[in-house]
Design a protein with these regions (language model features):
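Acidic-basic catalytic patches of nuclease active cores, encompassing PD-(D/E)XK
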Residues: 1-25
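Conserved catalytic cores of phosphodiester-cleaving nucleases, focusing on short active-site segments
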Residues: 15, 36-53, 64, 72
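The start of beta-strands in P-loop NTPase/AAA+ ATPase cores
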Residues: 19-23, 30, 43, 88
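Anionic group-transfer/hydrolysis microenvironments
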Residues: 26, 37, 50-52, 95-98, ...
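Short acidic/glycine-enriched loop/turn segments that link adjacent beta-strands
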Residues: 29-32, 101
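A short acidic, helix-capping loop that chelates divalent metal ions and anchors anionic groups
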Residues: 55-59
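Mid-chain, well-packed structural core segment of small domains
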Residues: 60-88
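Domain-level recognition of nuclease-like catalytic cores that cleave nucleotide substrates
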Residues: 82-119
Length: 119
């Protein structure tokens, strides 16, 4: 299993332990992918997972640049268009997973929103 897949599995477990209902994993659309889509306390959450062995080359969150955010946002719009249920509240989160002697998870709620997208 590759590093990214391990990180995603740890992130799913992390979210489930906190009461999230996991709706989708690796939801793909022509313009992108969303690692985890979950529902928690009335909020539909789109989560990007970034996994690293260290922060030697920067924080994993830094890899979620404006291009990646736009891909996630566009894919989320597509996901919402396929649902018969109308979600009134959505959120975009990032989970940083560090794999090493001691694995660590850093959960960033509201990491970005539609207003963060650059043209």
């Amino acid at each position: 299993m590759n590093l990214g897949r391990v990180g995603e599995e740890l992130a799913v477990r992390f979210l489930k332990e906190r009461g999230h209902d996991i709706l989708e994993q690796n939801f793909r659309f022509a313009h992108g992918e969303i690692d985890i889509i979950s529902f928690y306390k009335g909020v539909l959450i789109f989560t990007e997972v970034k996994t690293r062995r260290s922060d030697r080359y920067g924080r994993p969150m830094e890899a979620v640049d404006s291009f990646k955010r736009r891909q996630i946002y566009t894919t989320a719009e597509y996901f919402l268009s396929t649902q018969s249920i109308r979600y009134h509240s959505t959120r975009f989160d990032v989970i940083e997973v560090f794999i090493g002697e001691q694995s660590m998870i850093h959960y960033i709620k509201n990491a970005f929103n539609g207003n963060d997208l650059e043209a």
